[in-house]
Amino acid sequence: MLDELGQKIIKELQEDARQSFREIGRKLEISEGTVRNRVKGLVKNNTMKISAIPNPEQLGFNFMCVMCIEVKVGSAERVEQLLIKSPNVYFICGCTGTYDIIGIFVFHTPKEFDEFVKNVIANIPEIVRTSTFVAMHISRSPWEHNLDVTELCKS
């Protein structure tokens, strides 16, 4: 479980991951060394990751869709591994229910998506069927909103 200090450090990094450990320490009234050690531990135990999150729209990826994919029994992991090779895959996961895989894909244009379906999806024989949902607008995105660690840890 993440303790209160860990939560506060993560929240500070979510607000500005470029701020120094000294600055975070000053805000939280702890030493720079404590912040450095805690961040190192949080990264090492895979509680958090520090990285840049690009905004696909700002990079010209104006066509986003969610694709639900049904595959032949026992082939979900193989299909996932094939799909994640594509630079257009933003997110992919195995799931339960009617479909076996759900992915979020980004493209510059609908034509580029069409080419992806024809050249990638259609050439994976384990795919039984797909259902695609085009995003009309994005209400919450990882580049604009972070998980509220403090609220999550209360539950």
Indicate where each model-derived feature is located.
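A compositional/biophysical signature of low hydrophobicity enriched in polar/charged and small residues
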Residues: 1-155
